[in-house]
Amino acid sequence: YEERLKALGGDDDELANGVYQEIKKQLVAQGVPPHEIAFAHDFNTDASRKVRNEKVNSGDIRILIGSTSKMGAGLNVQTRLAACHHVDCPWRPRDIEQRNGRIERQGNLHKDAGKNIRVFQYVTEGSFDALMWHQ
């Protein structure tokens, strides 16, 4: 992911200031309160990440947006997650497993109650990402 992002001339901060803000704007337009949406990159210390994780697990933060590098290994926020949305296709299969692992794990109240949890992949028809998801 990081290599691909650098090849495109971007970094997590650029994503945060562009794509992530647009996603938040659209969510707010659909009625999601802004304080229930957070960006993983805004939590830069162990203490702030702990607070973030507690807020996601309690439901105070309903939507957490971030990259694989910011939300990968060690992120335990599965308690109330109902869906995982992929807006790109990572180059490494283990990154897909890591992303889906945020939601598909023991301790998820939805999964443990037998409710469906969902994983979505968004792609542009005919794009390279579409090809990657089909491999």
Question: Predicted regions: what is each one?
Answer:
Residues 33-35, 73, 113-115:
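Residue-level signal for beta-strand positions within conserved beta-sheet cores that form or flank
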Residues 91-100, 104-135:
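A conserved SF2-helicase RecA2
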Residues 40, 66-67, 86-88, 121-123:
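Conserved beta-strand segments of the P-loop GTPase G domain that flank and frequently precede/overlap
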Residues 1-6, 44-46, 70-72, 90-92, ...:
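Short, solvent-exposed loop/turn segments at secondary-structure junctions
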Residues 1-41:
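Conserved helicase motor "Helicase C" RecA-like lobe of SF1/SF2 P-loop NTPases
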